[in-house]
Amino acid sequence: MDTAEEDICRVCRSEGTPEKPLYHPCVCTGSIKFIHQECLVQWLKHSRKEYCELCKHRFAFTPIYSPDMPSRLPIQDIFAGLVTSIGTAIRYWFHYTLVAFAWLGVVPLTACRIYKCLFTGSVSSLLTLPLDMLSTENLLADCLQGCFVVTCTLCAFISLVWLREQIVHGGAPIWLEHAAPPFNAAGHHQNEAPVGGNGAENPAADQPANPAGENAVLGENPDAQDGQAEEEEEDNEEEDDAGVEDAADANNGAQDDMNWNALEWDRAAEELTWERMLGLDGSLVFLEHVFWVVSLNTLFILVFAFCPYHIGHFSLVGLGFEEHVQASHFEGLITTIVGYILLAITLIICHALATLVKFHRSRRLLGVCYIVVKVSLLVVVEIGVFPLICGWWLDICSLEMFDATLKDRELSFQSAPGTTMFLHWLVGMVYVFYFASFILLLREVLRPGVLWFLRNLNDPDFNPVQEMIHLPIYRHLRRFILSVIVFGSIVLLMLWLPIRIIKSLLPNFLPYNVMLYSDAPVSELSLELLLLQVVLPALLEQGHTRQWLKGLVRAWTVTAGYLLDLHSYLLGDQEENENSANQQVNNNQPARNNNAVPAGEGLHAAHQAILQQGGPVGFQPYRRPLNFPLRIFLLIVFMCITLLIASLICLTLPVFAGRWLMSFWTGTAKIHELYTAACGLYVCWLTIRAVTVLVAWMPQGRRVIFQKVKEWSLMIMKTLIVAVLLAGVVPLLLGLLFELVIVAPLRVPLDQTPLFYPWQDWALGVLHAKIIAAITLMGPQWWLKTVIEQVYANGIRNIDLHYIIRKLAAPVISVLLLSLCVPYVIASGAVPLLGVTAEMQNLVHRRIYPFLLMVVVLMGILSFQVRQFKRLYEHIKNDKYLVGQRLVNYERKSGKQGPSTPPPVSSQE
């Protein structure tokens, strides 16, 4: 047993003295049990923690006050402290008001007024700009528009910085680094090596000079490589060695400048924080940042909006296309894009001239500007134009499904062009996203090397920006055209053709009912809540759907492989083929067949370096059967037939099942087809889920199946009880309470009787319950948060019905019932006993719910102010009379850290 002489501090390893005694403030024992208070305070300052890092026990300090401290603080001390606190609060209020006014008022308003001034196109607007800045006309609208302008300029600035980093770290194109013409086929050929078709002639295809070259939506035409090779030879003959050396020197100098800038930025970043930049630290340095932001906004508006717009405008006016552009309802956007295209052409010409006269710095600057414009245009095409084309094509091919015509779409576009274009762009983005997701699923099933012509999104080296920087523009245009053809053909196959077949076979099935208003007796809000809260989470949040789809794809692939003798080509061989000579014969194909390249060579190895999410998978060889092209053609035909049948099933079965089920609820009334389709999909999902579970249980025997059915039946019963309580009773009571407290007093006059609709109250209650649950989970720890977290942690399979009812459902329902019943009892039972008039009884009955809510809110505010005053009292007492703090020893018997004390401080007085 340790003695007092052997007790040493865990930090300084010294013994205790009368001046510096040892304490044992936490659960730790042995040689780390004791510590000096000074050592602990120093360590807390260093570690910035308030608890022991070993036992997680929170250290406790007891305050030491001056002996002359009175039992109660004098009124003058409290008043002085209160005045000081109010003064500090006012100072901070003024400062934060100035910060908000600067960032939310001055910056966006200045950006909007400057933007309008530049695009007005008159000299008078420039002369009256200072007065326009101070104008209060359309203040709120200009601030909102200015916020959008500032956001655009900020995104442009961040994109420029990011593009610079891509050029610095990923390397600039060869034609920019060397003194060669801008259309340097040698540079392009080297950067495009991983994308070409002739893998056997390009053994360096796997070099990572341009990993983004693999990001092709569709495969490139291998015949184009011959022309590129000829251009490469010509450009190599014309290359100037002296120009290369000068360009290299200029590049080194530019690299030194970039390194110096990086050091300066790092040095500035050490001093600059978000609080200091925005002015939240209490200083006025942010005013300088406001000035620089306004200047940056003006510069970016002038360079990236004003100049391209006017270049495009003057060009369109000169060519006589101004009327056609104005008829599109997007004159500004189209004119700006035309300006960027003309600017890119001008930069190419100037770059070529600078190369001829050997102005290397100017040549590099023009090349970088061309890259910026080129990447910007490609981003607009990839993210804006392509999804928009897909969305419009989907709409055109599905007109008969909704009993619409092109005239209807034209009228909707004329009435709301912005909304129409956005909706079509959104539909196109969803289509592209799910198409890419399906391709990823195919890569997990098929043999590596089958889908070499599709972009590999799982490749960690995939970088679309590097691809935009390095590949020439004609490659992007060719890829864009091929992508449009393929995506459009898939829409024809899976949408337009099934609709024609459905109209021929089931003439009364179409069109779908997509009217905005329904004559159904059921509230649309209730149906939307069921769709959002029940159906969509089950269809989207479950991983079973993806596994089912993957299993179907694998089954189809196996079937097609055995029917067409393409199992080796589609899925690969399970075991190694002993006849390696046959492998070489089967896999060594002419250049026009890109699928026939030996393992580890050429295009396939480059494209299939990483195919699946699990990690890298090499290219796998396959056995090539006789009549291979014919079998591939039959495979494509079989695939098209399968996709057509699958599309027919998806367009008819869920809607038919949903209409049949909803007819029991809504009768013969027509409702939106979204609800019927969602209901049918949910029923189909439940059916498939039940079938798959039963199939998985079949090998385990009848007894195990009965046991599983019993367990699942019990779990379903518990879940239904919990759902009735938490998803039925609680939302209904909550919605009814909200109706009585907020909606009825505001919307219904006193001389009218409010009407309550249980379905609408329940739907609103579901929303309110979800909001309250989310706020509770984000808030501090208290009993409701603890219970909800425990219920979430248990899940459905480990559901504890007794715990949920006792800890969650019963308390919440009791509080809601008391909130509903107590005011009603007071208004209907107690008030009439007082002998008041009928008008007063009606007034009390209608206003007692909001009145009691105000009383509860006032009591909460009063309680909060009392706690704040106690904190202020303690703060004043500590400032005036606190002389130090003493560490509290850990008491093992009570298991608690000691009396309630203020939090530990980082210094000792």
UniProtKB/Swiss-Prot annotation:
Keywords: Acetylation, Endoplasmic reticulum, Membrane, Metal-binding, Transferase, Transmembrane, Transmembrane helix, Ubl conjugation, Ubl conjugation pathway, Zinc, Zinc-finger. It catalyses: S-ubiquitinyl-[E2 ubiquitin-conjugating enzyme]-L-cysteine + [acceptor protein]-L-lysine = [E2 ubiquitin-conjugating enzyme]-L-cysteine + N(6)-ubiquitinyl-[acceptor protein]-L-lysine. GO terms for cellular component: endoplasmic reticulum membrane. Pathway: Protein modification; protein ubiquitination. Auto-ubiquitinated, which results in proteasomal degradation. Deubiquitinated by USP19; protecting MARCHF6 from p97-mediated proteasomal degradation. Residues 1-91, 164-283, 358-376, 443-480, 541-631, 699-720, 785-814, 869-909 are cytoplasmic. It is a multi-pass membrane protein. Its EC number is 2.3.2.27. Its main location: endoplasmic reticulum. Residues 228-248 have a biased composition (Acidic residues). A zinc finger (RING-CH-type) spans 1-62. GO terms for biological process: proteasome-mediated ubiquitin-dependent protein catabolic process; protein K48-linked ubiquitination; protein ubiquitination. The keyword RNA-binding does not apply. Pfam families: MARCHF6_C, RINGv. It is found in: Endoplasmic reticulum membrane. It is an enzyme of class 2 (transferase). Signal peptide: none annotated. Residues 113-142, 305-336, 398-421, 502-519, 653-677, 742-763, 836-847 are extracellular. The chain crosses the membrane at residues 92-112, 143-163, 284-304, 337-357, 377-397, 422-442, 481-501, 520-540, 632-652, 678-698, 721-741, 764-784, 815-835, 848-868. Endoplasmic reticulum membrane-associated E3 ubiquitin ligase that plays a critical role in mitigating endoplasmic reticulum stress, the regulation of cholesterol and lipid homeostasis, and ferroptosis. Acts as a pivotal component of both the Ac/N-degron pathway (targeting the N-terminal acetyl group of substrates) and the ER-associated protein degradation-cytosol (ERAD-C) pathway (targeting misfolded substrates). For instance, mediates the degradation of Ac/N-degron-bearing proteins such as the G-protein regulator RGS2 and the lipid droplet protein PLIN2. Interacts with DIO2. Interacts with SQLE. PANTHER family: E3 UBIQUITIN-PROTEIN LIGASE MARCHF6 (PTHR13145:SF0), SSM4 PROTEIN (PTHR13145). The RING-CH-type zinc finger domain is required for E3 ligase activity. This is E3 ubiquitin-protein ligase MARCHF6. The gene is Marchf6.
